[in-house]
Amino acid sequence: MPESGIPVRDEIAGMIGLIQRVTRADVRVDGNVIGAIERGILALIGVRRGDQPEAAHRLLERLLTYRIFPDAQGRMNLSLRDIGGGLLLVPQFTLAADTQKGTRAGFSTAAAPDEARRLFAFLLEQAQAAHMPVAAGIFGADMQVSLVNDGPVTFWLETSAPAP
């Protein structure tokens, strides 16, 4: 890390997806449900500084193919695509925070709001083209997320930073 304390791009991992296997989930804004799914994945999405559309492509492929659902033998061998489950994407910039030091998160590693909004919208558009059903939260809104975590099963997915 440079003396400035701000990581350079190749020291920052790519986009983040905190995924939870759910039996149902919804997201609300001002008390109104704006997105809901039944069995599937709730994915909280963090965008880091320097992330590009390629990172969104890689993350989406992992969201759709990561094997977290049980097969007939109870083993996690099935993906969201395999079961035809729902995908609820919720933007959460705090996932991109630097929490390595102190007692307060730093956000120098998070993408600027306009950049993050653009990449989240791109991820959502790509998800809707590749899979159904897809629902989403609203970037920058104060949201309330409700879910029934199945298992519980929760994973932290990161795309790797592109090679320089």
Kindly label every feature range from the protein language model:
Residues 11-136, 150, 154-155, 159-164:
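Short Lys/Arg-rich amphipathic alpha-helical segments
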Residues 142-146:
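Beta-rich nucleic-acid/ligand-interaction surfaces
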